[in-house]
Amino acid sequence: MKNLNIIFAGTPDFAAQHLQALLASNHNVIAVYTQPDKPAGRGKKLQASPVKQLAQQHNLPVYQPKSLRNEEAQSELAALNADVMVVVAYGLILPKAVLEAPRLGCLNVHGSILPRWRGAAPIQRAIWAGDKQTGVTVMQMNEGLDTGDMLHKVYCEITPQETSATLYQKLAQLAPSALIEVLDHLEDGSFQPQVQDDSQSCYADKLTKEEAKLDWTLPAAQLERNIRAFNPAPTAFLTLNLNGNEERIKIYQADVLPHQEKAAGTVLACDKKGVQIATADGVLNITRLQPSGKKPMSVQDFLNGRADWFQAGNVLS
């Protein structure tokens, strides 16, 4: 095994966990690329990404270009003379000049079993679609969107209770070791590049706030998956009209009950077992929710002082 000189590019916590694994490996991280600091919190103070914070703790050189499309940024990267560049949830497009700069090219860790769920939200879309398993793919990067040749796949189960938050953590445990395994054997032929079958591909579009609103014309099973896929963000919600004011209620947990012959959106019951709402197919039984300005709570706690918010027979929009 040859120790490689690596440029690491990433931004969120998921990426930072990969950088941590690289720092604990026999390879050398010679530079770190991450997104520019962004305003965060109530004071809108500039905040460094988790990757930058970790890099600074280890006194690594940090680069934060707004784009890698200009020649100056590309020359700066090429001058690092890296063996390979590892990209994990970086957030910037890598042009051809950057992809070709390292001696062994660029590797990416993607949160799905490619070619399924190329794109921005593979973890969420796997839950949304009702997939029974997912995983991570370590691949060679090309100019397409997650279309490069695959080197290594690691699988994991999606449980019936899985949320995007829990699946994110599962993959964050699996992926770094898969990456290190590929890097350890990158030049000995252990991992042969496998071309993706484009006919089997689908795209994981980013979740939108509009999509987060529960649509009662969908089946209850789909809405229950949406709730888990949209947890923690952008969080599924419904709206109530309370004395002429619109109240937005975030929904964190629900289960599916057999169908009753009522119009979609009709409130069937509201008791300690849950808020039961008719859908296009089946009943959505909401068990954990969050009124505006409050913390997430069980339906039992919600009913204290709010028992009249969901009245049987009312139809939600």
Curated annotation (Swiss-Prot):
InterPro entries for this protein: Fmt, Formyl_trans_C, Formyl_trans_C_sf, Formyl_transf_N, Formyl_transf_N_sf, Formyl_transferase-like_C_sf, GART_AS, Met-tRNA-FMT_C
Catalytic activity: L-methionyl-tRNA(fMet) + (6R)-10-formyltetrahydrofolate = N-formyl-L-methionyl-tRNA(fMet) + (6S)-5,6,7,8-tetrahydrofolate + H(+)
UniProt GO cellular component terms: cytosol
Binding-site residues, (6S)-5,6,7,8-tetrahydrofolate: S112, I113, L114, P115
UniProt key word Cytoplasm: no
Pfam families with a match to the protein in the record: Formyl_trans_C, Formyl_trans_N
Enzyme's top EC category: transferase
GO MF entries: methionyl-tRNA formyltransferase activity
Function: Attaches a formyl group to the free amino group of methionyl-tRNA(fMet). The formyl group appears to play a dual role in the initiator identity of N-formylmethionyl-tRNA by promoting its recognition by IF2 and preventing the misappropriation of this tRNA by the elongation apparatus.
Family, similarity comment: Belongs to the Fmt family.
Record-given protein name: Methionyl-tRNA formyltransferase
Organism: Actinobacillus succinogenes (strain ATCC 55618 / DSM 22257 / CCUG 43843 / 130Z)
Lineage of source species: Bacteria, Pseudomonadati, Pseudomonadota, Gammaproteobacteria, Pasteurellales
Designated gene of the protein: fmt
